[in-house]
């Protein structure tokens, strides 16, 4: 009798395991195609970005700095340090400087490498850079002085132009990038963030009308940003071409620091060069099509030639 009871118990257990297995397999097989596509998307064009910029569990790895970041009027860190430090929060209660130092704008059309240059300047000086904007993504990822626009920071990021935009500044660094590449970078930023990319179907939205109007509007803004600061701003202007920065990071940084009257620390500069890529420079991605129409290319070529000639840059590309 006892033996029969054990057999019934074992049979019942087997049936329960069998039913549980069927339910599990049914749940897996009913997963929607969209969910499966989302799960597998990392193996496509975004895989490199995801692996490079995101750590375990999809979180960004902490930025590493060559020394502690500080405001201009804060005491320097102890001499021990040019070891690599992780991003740290800056005290929000810090009393901003009123030291009378001339405020310097770091100006560019969006998509011209402003964030990357800010990163390089922070690495090579240990001094925070500010901004007229408050980008929460940057605020949490290495730029704790976002929305600080006074002389407590090394430079202040802006994309604005005109008398009101110029008024606070005594000097300006004007970062200029080829409009074809800058417009594309800005389109990618609006679609995919500071280091992401626009998907190909974004260019074809509304049968291409959105992209066509975007190029027209941004080409005009590119011209206005660069010419207004170069020709109408009454303070000293340091022209920096993005291509020159890419080709000669050290020389360009040295010339910028000289313009800022900021002493070069060779150890920090060497560390900055070692870590020059950071996470704020969008990696190249080769599109399988040309997003610019022949008419767009013609308009861009004409405007590039006009602006570059006005800036004293006489090569066409």
UniProtKB/Swiss-Prot annotation:
Highest taxon of source: Eukaryota
Residues linked to a glycan: 150, 226, 232
Subcellular location: Membrane
Molecular function terms from GO: sulfotransferase activity
Membrane topology: Single-pass membrane protein
Gene3D superfamilies hit by this protein: P-loop containing nucleotide triphosphate hydrolases
Keywords: Glycoprotein, Membrane, Transmembrane, Transmembrane helix
Protein name in the entry: WSCD family member AAEL009094
The keyword rRNA-binding belongs to this UniProt entry's keyword annotation: no
Annotated transmembrane regions: 8-28
SUPFAM superfamilies listed in its UniProt record: P-loop containing nucleoside triphosphate hydrolases (SSF52540)
InterPro entries documented for this protein: P-loop_NTPase, Sialate-O-sulfotransferase, Sulfotransferase_dom
Main location group: membrane
GO cellular component: membrane
Family: Belongs to the WSCD family.
């Amino acid at each position: 009798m006892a033996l029969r009871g054990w057999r019934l118990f074992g049979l019942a257990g087997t049936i329960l395991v069998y039913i549980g297995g069927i339910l599990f397999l049914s749940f897996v097989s009913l997963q929607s195609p969209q969910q499966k596509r989302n799960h597998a998307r990392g193996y496509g064009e975004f895989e490199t970005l995801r692996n490079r910029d995101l750590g375990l569990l999809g979180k960004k790895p902490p930025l590493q700095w060559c020394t502690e970041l500080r405001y201009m009027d804060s005491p320097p860190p102890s001499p021990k340090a040019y070891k690599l430090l992780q991003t740290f929060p800056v005290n929000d209660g810090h009393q901003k400087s009123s030291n009378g130092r001339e405020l310097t704008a770091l100006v560019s059309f969006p998509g011209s490498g402003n964030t990357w240059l800010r990163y390089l300047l922070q690495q090579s000086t240990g001094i925070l850079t500010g901004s007229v904007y408050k980008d929460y993504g940057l605020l949490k990822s290495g730029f704790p002085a976002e929305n600080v626009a006074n002389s407590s920071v090394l430079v202040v990021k802006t994309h604005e132009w005109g008398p009101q935009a110029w008024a606070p500044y005594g000097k300006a660094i004007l970062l200029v990038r080829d409009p074809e590449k800058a417009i594309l970078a800005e389109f990618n930023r609006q679609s995919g963030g500071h280091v992401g990319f626009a998907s190909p179907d974004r260019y074809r939205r509304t049968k291409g009308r959105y992209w066509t109007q975007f190029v027209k509007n941004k080409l005009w803004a590119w011209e206005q940003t660069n010419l207004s600061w170069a020709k109408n701003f009454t303070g000293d202007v340091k022209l920096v071409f993005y291509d020159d920065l890419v080709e000669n990071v050290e020389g360009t940084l040295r010339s910028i620091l000289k313009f800022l009257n900021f002493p070069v620390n060779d150890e920090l500069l060497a560390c900055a060069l070692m870590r020059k890529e950071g996470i704020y420079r969008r990696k190249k991605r080769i599109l399988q099509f040309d997003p610019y129409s022949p008419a767009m290319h013609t308009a861009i070529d004409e405007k590039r030639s006009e602006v570059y000639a006005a800036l004293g840059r006489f090569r066409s590309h």
